[in-house]
Amino acid sequence: MSVQNICSTKAYDMLISNDNAFLVDVRTREEWQQVGIPHLDNKNKMLFLSWQLNKDFEDNFLSIINDKIHAIIFFLCRSGYRSFIAANFITNIGYKNCYNISDGFEGNNQDKGWKQNNLPWQF
């Protein structure tokens, strides 16, 4: 199964309505601090694992979400590129319900993104 692209508004709806859904934000620590992060009422549904230059990404991911092989996992970055790569990587190790939030946190050339779509976020 391949990674599916999904817009931020649909991903948010699925995240808040499904107890088995998780958000993995793969941006850098600097991006989280300077631009903001998504806000979900259930903090246990959010993982912050920087993808860039992180040789421990797989180990860190598995240490947190190892027992949730059937979970629905949404990957988020600034504009949808890094998150797509991370989602593919995790799909290749056995997780089949991976989605790339294609418009990202800040948007891309075609779409607004999490923040500009007025979805909950915070610093």
From Swiss-Prot:
InterPro entries: Rhodanese-like_dom, Rhodanese-like_dom_sf, STR4-like
SMART domains: RHOD
Span of domain Rhodanese: 17-117
Entries under Pfam families matching the protein: Rhodanese
Highest taxon listed in the record's lineage: Bacteria
PROSITE patterns (UniProt xref): RHODANESE_3
Disulfide links within the chain: none
PANTHER family: RHODANESE-LIKE DOMAIN-CONTAINING PROTEIN 4, CHLOROPLASTIC (PTHR47377:SF1)
Identification of the protein by name: Uncharacterized protein RP600 homolog
Organism placement in taxonomy: Bacteria, Pseudomonadati, Pseudomonadota, Alphaproteobacteria, Rickettsiales
